Amino acid sequence: MEDKTNVMRILDQKKISYTAHTYDSSKAISGTEVAAYLNQNPDRVFKTLVTVAKSGKNYVFVIPVEAELDLKKAAKAVGEKSIDMLKSKDLLPLTGYIHGGCSPIGMKKLFPTTFQKEAEEYNTIMFSAGKIGYQVEMNIKDLAKVIPYKTADITIDNI
C-alpha cells in the first residue's frame, strides 16, 4: 500500500496488528457498497458516527454500515438525556475527519466511544482508516490499546 493514513501510523506505533484495505473512492460510495466491494459481510464493516448531547458533550458511536443509530438507546448508553447527530459542517473542525472518512482512532480529541455490542462477536471488524478509500481490519480487543471504548445495544432493531 502506497499511502498510510494517520490511523495506520498510530496502529503501527502501538505495534497493533491490522490489515489495510483500499477501494476506489472516485465515486460516491456507501458503507454497504464498501462492504460489497471488499467482499465482506456488512455486519463486520462498521461506520463511525459523531454525536452531540444536550449537555454539549460529544460522543462517538460505531455501528455496522447497514444499521441505523437509535438515538434514545445511544443516549441511555452514555448516560445522557438526549443526543443528536453532529452536523456535517462541524465534523472536520471537531474530529479532523470528513464525512465518509471518519475513524474512531486518531480524532483531534478523545471522545467517549461506544461500539454496537455485536462487534465483539467477530474475530475482526473493519472501519475507516481515516481517509475515504481506506479501511482497517483488526480485532476489537486490540482497539482498547489505542482508545477506551465500551459496547452496548445502540442500533434500531429491525423486526
Question: Which sequence ranges carry the predicted segments?
Answer:
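Extended, low-hydrophobicity, polar/charged segments
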Residues: 1-159
